[in-house]
Amino acid sequence: FWVQTNPGTRPGPMMKVASGGELSRFLLALKVVLSDRGSAPTLVFDEIDTGVGGAVADAIGARLARLAGKVQVMAVTHAPQVAARADQHLLISKAALDKGKRVATRVEPLANEHRREEIARMLAGAEITKEARAAAEQLLKAAG
């Protein structure tokens, strides 16, 4: 695809011209259009929010939530704005085993308090503050 991302610039190949955020939004738009045509009952988005800020991540989360009304949506995200809008939240983690010779992946469903704590961790990092918990609670309330 050739795109023109800003007025006054020349069109060019999307992979060279578009930013990470622009590529993410294009992929989301493309999958939305394809889902309207009944192309797949499940859509998987792997870090669709890469390279975007909080407001755009919130808009992506809202669009994914609307899309989930039509098809099953699975999204891997590091954005708390996206995670807060999910119907189900799974925490995926990896751990080294056998002194680093093997890796095990764990998938843990989160509910209520654990979900709020994970969203707070996504916001604050390793040290979760009361402000991060309050912000996580606000994101969950806003998401409905």
Predicted features by range, described:
Residues 55-144:
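C-terminal lobe/lid and adjacent interdomain/linker elements of RecA-like ASCE P-loop ATPase modules
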Residues 1, 5-7, 21-43:
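GG-anchored amphipathic helix commonly corresponding to the ABC/SMC/Rad50 NBD signature/C-loop
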Residues 7-11, 22, 101, 113:
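Short flexible coil/turn linkers enriched for glycine and charged/polar residues
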Residues 11-17:
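Short pre-catalytic strand/loop immediately N-terminal to key active-site residues, enriched for Gly-Thr
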Residues 1, 17, 27, 116-125:
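Internal helix-turn-beta structural module
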